[in-house]
Amino acid sequence: MKVIIIALVVAFAIRYFLISPVTVYGDSMDPTLHDGEHLFINKLSTPKRFDIIVFPAPDEKGAEYIKRVIGLPGDKVEYKKDTLYINGKKYDEPYLEGEKEKVANGYLTNNFKLEDLPAVKNAKVVPKNHLFVLGDNRRISKDSRYIGFISEDDVIGKVISFGSSLKR
């Protein structure tokens, strides 16, 4: 009996304080993550650039968003001709390459500078203790371009596992 209680306590602690399952709702992270896909998040991990994170939707009570971290505190983020620049340095986004090829006219990600986005209130850099996030499906994603910066304190967890092996 004692072993069962210890096992339950350990399972509870892991589930609520370390690793938690989440489900993708919507298409904003296509082609990387798909609607209905099941994921695991690490609740203790500190997000790094290009990590996929989960956070409470600031504009939908009770909902959660899953997005990719693009900008870290102090970063200047800009898109020019479908190319990401952070602090003036060009970054490749291999997770988008197949999607960029499908765009017949225009760009997958429209040109922008942080200070041109109304949602970030003319900020030139990502503020301290905040993140700039984008969905991989740039044409439909409701992300930092529209909802503003995400507080690091609001991050529920970092995605640590996804793929067909987790689909039900």
What do these predicted ranges mean?
Residues 1-2, 30, 138:
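Short hydrophobic/aromatic segments of transmembrane alpha-helices and their interfaces
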Residues 2-17:
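Hydrophobic membrane-insertion alpha-helices, especially the h-region
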Residues 13, 17, 35-168:
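Soluble "head" domains of membrane/secretory-pathway proteins
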Residues 22-35:
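Alpha-helical transmembrane signal-anchor/signal-peptide segments
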